[in-house]
Amino acid sequence: MKISNKKDQNDPTKEEIKFILELLNSNKLNEARKEIDKQITKYVNSSILFNIFGALFAAQNQLNNAIKNYQKAIKINPSYAQAYNNLGVALQKLNKLDDAILQYNKAINLKNDFPEAYNNLGNAYLDLNKPENSIEYFTKALSVKPDFADAYNNLGTLFSDVARFDESMLNYKKAIELSPNNEKYYNNLGTLLNTLGKYDEATTEFNRAIKIKPDYAKAYSNHIFNLNYITNLDKNFYLSEAKKFGLNCKTIKKDFLAQYQYEKEPKKLKLGFVSSDFGNHPGGFFTLSALRELKKKNFDLIAYSAYDRKDDFSPHFRPLFLKWHSIEKMKDDEVVEQIFKDGIHILIEAQGHSAKNRIPIFMYKAAPIQLSWLSTGTLGVAEIDYLIGSPHMTPQDEENHFVEKIWRLPEITQCFTPPDFDVKIKSLPASRNHFITFGSVNKSAKVNDDEVALWSKILSSIPNSKLLLKNRDFDSQKIVENTLARFEKHKIKNHRLILKGKSQTRKELLEIYNEIDIALDPFPFQGHTSTCEGVWMGVPVITLKGDRFVFHSGESINTNLNMHDWIAKTYEEYVSKAIKFSSDIDLLSKIRKTLRETALQSPVFDSPRFAKHFSVMLWDMWRKFIKKSTKLEQL
């Protein structure tokens, strides 16, 4: 932490200040607090001490106390630029972005060569989704301090967010060059490489981050999530990497096991849901309708929101929960204390190793039963009791892929929430175009070389057919050029491909299916969300039967739609089915007219049916826990 170079008789000596800062930087917070308390009795009007006191509270995540002390420092010394900057940081952590920006500007007005304040201002505008403002201030930070690694890193993140991937790459690499021991920069570069479909290179960067910080949970999660994209992955390797996460990121400070107090036969079970996806996100689409139905049953639902989304879908969630805890700014042990205080019976991890997860919370075992739902495979955490499976997602011969015990629902692992607005299904595109349009509405990272080869065979086998690929990644000219070049290697000309970027609304996204005759499911990391959206829009999906959790979702959906003939067992069968179905325009037209209604009545969309099975499962888990606990008591 920086402090003002100026001091007067109201401030401690440089040696005294240095000693306190060394304690703070060594994370010896209790010792630092004692030293500050001692010094502040001697220097009651020290702006520097109150600024440091604020930093101490900020390190303890006591942001309101931090703010009070920064304000005291400013009251004593209204020209204290660093205190204004620190006040802005605390306000930004509380999502008071306009107030934070005001403080950063005050700091800059007092000290116009203040790179940290410019950098923080850029981050605040990034949080406000104003990238042009962010670019301006990150650039200003670098003009003042050309070797400012963090500003380069932030530019890398900004450019990645707006699909300017070449510039993102350059800035991340510059940050690493300037600060080669910062694990966050390698993690961010790995995330970018995953977006670009460079899975092996991404793995290298995630491992570099982990080597620097062996308990770096975010890099571990990104590494494990990245493995989902790799074709022919050794399942034992995935399991071993997940187990490393479970062991190396475990920093338990309190044992809750002996402290549980619960009724053996409660009238309602308290269910805690931990997720960053309560909003316009695939995780939100797969939870909303189920939560609506569970609320009607004998459960109290409590949310632990790891990221409060602000979109047109997020307002549907809060009314479903008895309590809503925003945990994004809370430390793991603080969240765990809240979970224990709430008396949760069953704690549900509802997103897996995707972005902004809080899986380490589950290592504390703050609830009697913990389970994984909506993940892409094992979480690797021994303290999680169960992973929710189904006959097709978790076949018995794959149980050894998981750390958790598998608890199978009878039909499907998750239920999709249809949009609450109508999108008209138009007639079959082929009947208008006189050629077949295949499509995949998925991240470009899911389009691997095996798929490109397979989809090229399909296009080569069906004259005049086209392939539509849509995702915000295709707003990047680099990804467009790379995609065209990859297909050209298989003699597929550019005019056979239709590449479309980001949609402004979800309705606009769904309307793209009116341009697709047959959807092609990617593999091994299959579509799931795009498959459900496609069938709701009347578009059937050819999928490949796989050999691991993420590689089973298409099979599971099509099985529950009674569309068994659309599941291929081999690459050759995948191609032959595409050829067969594309030649039967009458069948495709019939499917288009009936598939939405069929889907809505199937387990894929039938939320009351799903919630019934889910409810039985939860109560059976509780009774099993009570029975086991009673036996232990008798021993």
Give the location of each predicted region.
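Alpha-helical solenoid repeat scaffolds of the TPR/TPR-like class and their adjacent stem/linker regions
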Residues: M1-F435, K443, D449, A453, ...
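Glycine- and acidic
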Residues: G272-S276, I436-N442, N464-K470, I498
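A conserved nucleotide-sugar
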Residues: N298-D300, S456-K489, N494
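Catalytic cores of eukaryotic secretory-pathway lumenal/extracellular enzymes that build
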Residues: L497, G501-S503
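Aromatic "clamp/platform" in nucleotide-sugar-dependent glycosyltransferases that forms part
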Residues: P524
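Short alpha-helix at the nucleotide-sugar/activated-sugar donor binding site of glycosyltransferases
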Residues: V535-W536, T559
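Short acidic/histidine- and often glycine-rich active-site loop of Leloir-type glycosyltransferases
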Residues: F551-N562
